[in-house]
Amino acid sequence: MASFLRILGIETSCDETAAAIVERQDDGTAIVRSDVVLSQLDEHSAYGGVVPEIAARAHVEALDTLIDEALKRANVSLADVDAIAATSGPGLIGGLLVGLMTGKAISKATGKPLYAINHLEGHALTARLTDGLAFPYLMLLVSGGHTQLILVRGVGQYERWGTTIDDALGEAFDKTAKLLGLPYPGGPAVEAAAKKGNPDRFDLPRPLVGETRLDFSFSGLKTAVRLAATTIAPVSEQDIADICASFQKAVSRTLKDRIGRGLQRFKSEFPKTAEKPALVVAGGVAANLELRRTLQELCDLNGFRFIAPPLSLCTDNAVMIAWAGLERMATGAAPDGLDVQPRSRWPLDQKAETLLGHGKRGAKA
């Protein structure tokens, strides 16, 4: 009998098409046999953001080829995989349909079970793949579509402690870049400009700092950036750098307050964890070095491990989707039927209060 489970992962929730082959050993460790990702950056850059119809068509054109490439790199065939895991939400509905329907077709043709995976669960469980992290732990998800602080108790057991009430952090970066005439994607552009700027020139707001609830807000910060740029227009290259540096400083101070309160709550609820408590960061914004420095310092101050998976596993990828499927299989969870439907909105915490917050992919929960 095989001492491992092998799964094909498929990810098409936004503007990356991805496929991967991942194995889970009996001892819970993972082996990534292949990881193939095709970015649609060139297709969307002219529009300053992701265009859903263009994204869906690009997934249709690329996915079959990427799955073949993932199998080839892993030196396996579909007959050698034990199951298929495909993202079924949240995200852009057109892209989700492409990936999930492909997963269904493979499941039907091969008789292999299908697992419809929540994209956010993929992010939530990635640290167990990379670092063998034990439950429970905290995760900060920061991307173009999400800003959430989540308690991860176990596979399928998630509590949302905080979320954005308006813009997601990645969206705030992108909109700030657009306001200042910087290229898409905005996150890297703002970070690069900030390195040449004075973070103390503009006193930008730090939304919700001091409040006991753990939610986030970035819409007002984005508005303050616009007002600052308008006041000194026309802006020079140095002005742009100073605004970006001031923006990043405001974001860092905001996160320091919000996450710091979350770490204290975790310690009060779990005073005797077997291992050193951990904060995991995931999502494309996790690539920002200033953000990482802030979170590392915060964790050091509070006695937490800070875990930031490799960038390739922070942004959208199929490895995390495959791994989430393997984690579910290991718990004995039943596969999904072929009648499972994609969901543009699918909160991890089904009991959490619905808020008005939304990012690029629509309201989140």
Swiss-Prot record:
Substrate binds at L141, V142, S143, G144, G145, D174, G187, N288. Belongs to the KAE1 / TsaD family. The gene is tsaD. HAMAP family: TsaD. GO terms for biological process: tRNA threonylcarbamoyladenosine modification. Its cofactor is Fe(2+). Transmembrane segments: none annotated. It catalyses: L-threonylcarbamoyladenylate + adenosine(37) in tRNA = N(6)-L-threonylcarbamoyladenosine(37) in tRNA + AMP + H(+). This is tRNA N6-adenosine threonylcarbamoyltransferase. One of its GO terms (molecular function) is iron ion binding. It is an enzyme of class 2 (transferase). GO terms for cellular component: cytoplasm. Keywords: Acyltransferase, Cytoplasm, Iron, Metal-binding, Transferase, tRNA processing. Required for the formation of a threonylcarbamoyl group on adenosine at position 37 (t(6)A37) in tRNAs that read codons beginning with adenine. Is involved in the transfer of the threonylcarbamoyl moiety of threonylcarbamoyl-AMP (TC-AMP) to the N6 group of A37, together with TsaE and TsaB. TsaD likely plays a direct catalytic role in this reaction.
